[in-house]
Amino acid sequence: MFGKKKKKIEISGPSNFEHRVHTGFDPQEQKFTGLPQQWHSLLADTANRPKPMVDPSCITPIQLAPMKTIVRGNKSCKESSINGLLEDFDNISVTRSNSLRKESPPTPDQGAASRIQGHSEENGFITFSQYSSESDTTTDYTTEKYRDRSLYGDDLDLYYRGSHAAKQNGHAMKMKHGDAYYPEMKPLKSDLARFPVDYHTHLDSLSKASEYGDLKWDYQRASSSSPLDYSFQLTPSRTAGTSRCSKESLAYSESDWGPSFDDYDRRPKSSYLHQTSPQPAMRQRSKSGSGLQEPMMPFGASAFKTHPQGHSYNSYTYPRLSEPTMCIPKVDYDRAQMVFSPPLSGSDTYPRGPTKLPQSQSKVGYSSSSHQYPGYHKASLYHHPSLQTSSQYISTASYLSSLSISSSTYPPPSWGSSSDQQPSRVSHEQFRAALQLVVSPGDPREYLDNFIKIGEGSTGIVCIATEKHTGKQVAVKKMDLRKQQRRELLFNEVVIMRDYHHDNVVDMYNSYLVGDELWVVMEFLEGGALTDIVTHTRMNEEQIATVCLSVLKALSYLHNQGVIHRDIKSDSILLTSDGRIKLSDFGFCAQVSKEVPKRKSLVGTPYWMAPEVISRLPYGTEVDIWSLGIMVIEMIDGEPPYFNEPPLQAMRRIRDSLPPRVKDLHKVSSMLRGFLDLMLVREPSQRATAQELLGHPFLKLAGPPSCIVPLMRQYRHH
């Protein structure tokens, strides 16, 4: 107590101190300045950017842990039209679009939720029930409150095939001939029952089949001569005493396996049903004009099967029509048995059947060669021993098929049998093993370190990492296999960037499986995305021409290879520090060929989507040209057309209205207007190709890459 006081420890000041990061806040702009890159990505406006969406018709079922049971209600929607549903878009936080979040969103307010029919909520998720006129089965929709300016295929699937197509009182609603631009396109119907972004995480959430009052869905062609005259009828219906099936698998025919132009019958074609009770709750009707006896399901529905232990597992099948006399059509294996080619099969031609996965095929008709994807890896430090010849690539589909089912055709369905075996499922382990065949062995962490997250997208996160030996920075895109809406699209990230190299395409070094994540190592472009420039600065016509020239060179190369990017926008254009422009984000691309000349899946980002994509018409490489035209408007006006409107409403405007225009036409030269008019043509066959646009006089205004550098300096000062 009275001892000698201890000497106070002296702490010296920092030595060799230097300010490397100078942060501040601009009160006029109300923005932070000088933030480090990883901080800026968290505070930037990119969170408000619309996310791309995919067609849910080919979502792959996998085995997942069950979520707690969601109880449904019987409320019906207040309004029948799509407008009543679009009102809620402005009230939803865009942060809910994050596909990598670890928790469920908070429970939405009851006022907004009451606009959606036949649902109740729990932890922010809404469960829907629709009653099909072709099937006395209850189909459960586990959905999440939709997000502002973030639209996925789940949303638009229901946007097309929704339960809101008629008034609450069940009166039929007809589309008039003048309601849409294309006389042959399908009407858009709005059901905004949104699936959560972590779609597979919630597919298996219902632990038992429930019996509730549902809605009877009557979809039929009207007797009018106009191809747009449909009648939609919803009538309340209860089936007391009728046993619901608790084991069922849903089959879709919204495939892109061939040039089928049946615009009216491209509906859910069949259901493969397992009954737990002896009474079959199934009706069949003959589709007009086809004589096909088949049950129907609402498109995009998730059919659940009850596991004996109470866990629910879902199963999907994706056959195409080939046997008009069967209740479940047989897959055309002449088309389905393809060498596993991810750009072709990974996007929207990945057929599945109730008892068999696709087999390998020896020929695929590409533009110049069979493109069986030899193991190409850039000769660099990133090179690791990998599969080098096409013969070493085992067909992923046949590999997965060999793990489960050996039969080559679909057996006839037994609607009343409770002992039928359940359709085969692709487990996570099987899918991971298939993906392992096309990536390189090894762990990139052996030669990379200092991982810093700089961005986040709908499929994964992006980090920068440093090569240990050279100090070179690379970008690493990390995608969790268990958190994808469509796992097959992950193959695009690997194969397209690996096999197609161009000066204006982001270079991929290698890809790996690290645990349950796909890691794609690619070049790091320090200049960031074009979005930063168009948002914070204004571009002159020389700079616009420079960007267009580089993007058109990349598109011309890809289109000649039969590759459709399907997500052209400023977010997909990256810049180097010296102003060079490169195309990136190939996760939503598709391959076309002589055998598969058109696509029909709903893929893209709403504001940039071409009218034919929204209208569900068969499309080709022309959709990228339309999206590029929208991106030109984005470079002129700072945002795409209709950007102040909710995604669905903007899509309806794109579908029904004349091509969008620049806000201030008087500020645009006649040469640029003419260039834009060649891209924003509603009729795809009249739209200019990338090669044709490369010869346009406007592109002669293009300057060197250095003319873009001042723009990067400007937005960094904001």
Curated annotation (Swiss-Prot):
Q: Where is the Protein kinase domain?
A: 448-699
Where the record annotates domain CRIB, the positions are 11-24
A Pfam family reported for this protein in Swiss-Prot or TrEMBL: PBD
Q: Tell me which residues bear Phosphothreonine.
A: T107
- Enzyme class, top EC level, equals transferase
EC annotation from Swiss-Prot or TrEMBL: 2.7.11.1
Q: Where does ATP bind?
A: I454, G455, E456, G457, S458, T459, G460, I461, V462, K477
Keywords, A to Z, come to: Apoptosis, ATP-binding, Cytoplasm, Kinase, Mitochondrion, Nucleotide-binding, Nucleus, Phosphoprotein, Serine/threonine-protein kinase, Transferase
Q: Which cysteines are joined by disulfide bonds?
A: none
**Which CDD domains does the UniProt entry name for this protein?**
CRIB_PAK_like, STKc_PAK5
| Sequence similarity | Belongs to the protein kinase superfamily. STE Ser/Thr protein kinase family. STE20 subfamily.
Q: Self-association or partners: how does it assemble?
A: Interacts tightly with GTP-bound but not GDP-bound CDC42/p21 and RAC1. Interacts with MARK2, leading to inhibit MARK2 independently of kinase activity. Interacts with RHOD and RHOH.
Q: What PANTHER family does the entry give?
A: NON-SPECIFIC SERINE_THREONINE PROTEIN KINASE, SERINE/THREONINE-PROTEIN KINASE SAMKA-RELATED-RELATED
This chain belongs to the protein called Serine/threonine-protein kinase PAK 5
* Species of the source: Rattus norvegicus (Rat)
